[in-house]
Regions:
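Vicinal oxygen chelate
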Residues: 1-5, 31-34, 54-126
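N-terminal beta-strand motif that seeds the catalytic metal site of vicinal oxygen chelate
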Residues: 1-11, 64-67, 119-126
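A short, acidic/glycine-rich surface segment
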Residues: 48-55, 125-126
Length: 126
């Protein structure tokens, strides 16, 4: 669950940039899906249903958190990066080969400052 300032705006970003779909909607809470798979919850920062989340309010939101979304294959990865770019996503690290992880990846930042990495599947070294 990510704490966000504006649930609708954040939900819209994940839908436009990554192709996720809304499964709940609302001003305080959202559930996002990839097809039938539940992948992410958004919760308004100042809503109080989960008071324990407020303990993180002292630090910068997004600090120490990164989300990873793996595409089905390399063409799907490239299409996902272009989709995110077309949706106005901030691409802070262009697509590149990560030799340690053996995949291609790109780094985005969502409207609340969370790091979002999209990557291709693991490619067996030859």
């Amino acid at each position: 669950m990510l704490q966000v300032a504006d649930v609708a705006a954040s939900s819209g970003w994940y839908q436009r940039a990554l192709g996720l779909r809304s499964g709940h909607g609302g001003d305080e809470f959202e559930m996002l899906f990839d097809g039938d798979a539940f992948v992410l919850q958004l919760h308004r920062l100042d809503a109080h249903e989960h008071g324990i989340l407020q303990s993180g309010a002292e630090g910068a939101r997004g600090s120490g958190v990164s989300l990873w979304f793996e595409a089905d294959d390399r063409p799907a990865f490239e299409a996902l990066v272009e989709r995110a770019r077309g949706a106005g996503a901030s691409v802070v690290e262009e697509p590149h080969w990560n030799p340690l992880a053996h995949h291609h990846e790109a780094t985005l930042v969502d409207p609340d400052g969370y790091v979002v990495v999209v990557n291709s599947p693991f490619e067996m070294p030859t």
